[in-house]
Amino acid sequence: MAGGLPHPVLWSTLLNVDTITIGGATVEFKHVFYTWCAMAILFSLGLIVRSSLKVVPGALQNVFEVVIGGLEDFVVGNIGEDGRKVFPLLGGIFLFILFQNLLGLVPGCDAPTANVNTNAAMALFVFGYYNYQGLKRWGPGYIKHFMGPMTWLTPLMLPLEIISHCARPLSLTLRLFGNIRGEEIVMVLFFLMAPIVGTLPVYFLFLLGKVLQAFIFFMLTMVYLKGAFEHAH
């Protein structure tokens, strides 16, 4: 089943890339294949837009300008001018996750974000990146972000903050995985119980859900970066 639709065969199965063998061990490869598909689609759209840039934008250029411009304004409004430096990453995260999510709506495809490994990789990258930015900005003083507002609270706040930060990758991973996989399962049930035409409104509801989940991941990443940039009190 693909993207919640009762489809008998996935494209990855037809191409024999569901699994690969590494050192005698069989490894699931399907989610990697569809991640590459999402990357290829996004990269191709970017090349098309870049090659057809006009003073009077066309339809596709208009869509990209509205989405990217709106996201950049949102980031700068929340983080400040530092947001412009990290926006390419934040915008890339949003579009990358969005296209991965949307693949789940295509018959014969499966959403890579419905696999916990894909989400864990992205969450660990975000964890490393915002801590890197914090260390780059504040140096050893970045540790003050974990120590609380008053010195006497440090023995209590330090372990709590470390646990809180270490839980962030797990939270990002499971939130995206649970919502996307849950949508896939519910959509399968809807399409099995009713004709396709009768479930089209529900289909568009799931489309909205996939956009929302990409935005939530993007927004949480932005919040973590904002915390890393702020001066510790």
From Swiss-Prot:
This is ATP synthase subunit a. Belongs to the ATPase A chain family. Keywords: ATP synthesis, Cell inner membrane, Cell membrane, CF(0), Hydrogen ion transport, Ion transport, Membrane, Transmembrane, Transmembrane helix, Transport. Disulfide bonds: none annotated. GO terms for cellular component: plasma membrane; proton-transporting ATP synthase complex. F-type ATPases have 2 components, CF(1) - the catalytic core - and CF(0) - the membrane proton channel. CF(1) has five subunits: alpha(3), beta(3), gamma(1), delta(1), epsilon(1). CF(0) has three main subunits: a(1), b(2) and c(9-12). The alpha and beta chains form an alternating ring which encloses part of the gamma chain. CF(1) is attached to CF(0) by a central stalk formed by the gamma and epsilon chains, while a peripheral stalk is formed by the delta and b chains. It is a multi-pass membrane protein. Its main location: membrane. It comes from the Bacteria. It is found in: Cell inner membrane. The chain crosses the membrane at residues 29-49, 86-106, 118-135, 188-208, 209-229. Key component of the proton channel; it plays a direct role in the translocation of protons across the membrane. Gene3D superfamilies: ATP synthase, F0 complex, subunit A. GO terms for biological process: proton motive force-driven plasma membrane ATP synthesis. Pfam families: ATP-synt_A.
